[in-house]
């Protein structure tokens, strides 16, 4: 229901806000504005270590086991059929939290072991993920051509233990071919 309302808002250019996303498109533009609706940095003890796990409502994770667990939020956007898109992200407001040890993602299996292992990303002195915003290939749902636009409003450097939190951003869908 929320996805359908977001689609209609995109198609009819009616201001609508869902999970922090708001359509701000003008003619010949495909823009979404993101405003962080809140999050919690929960402390969790695993393997005798204290980790921080960022949590947001209506968010999923788009990570593999061993990678830093960072929530990702998504929405659908109606697009012209037969076109493909990329996304351009402009961060409008962010903050950096220091001395944070983000919990590694354990597993996609339904049965958890309670043991987490830090993957190779924890050895790198760079922010993860490298791409904060993504757009899917177009899909057809109920006769509408749509793309899924996803944003990870967190970025983590495991070596410096810095967590960047995005409070607001603008995303523009850019036509990248047919």
Please give the residue ranges for each predicted region.
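Extracellular pro-sequences of secreted precursors
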Residues: 3-178
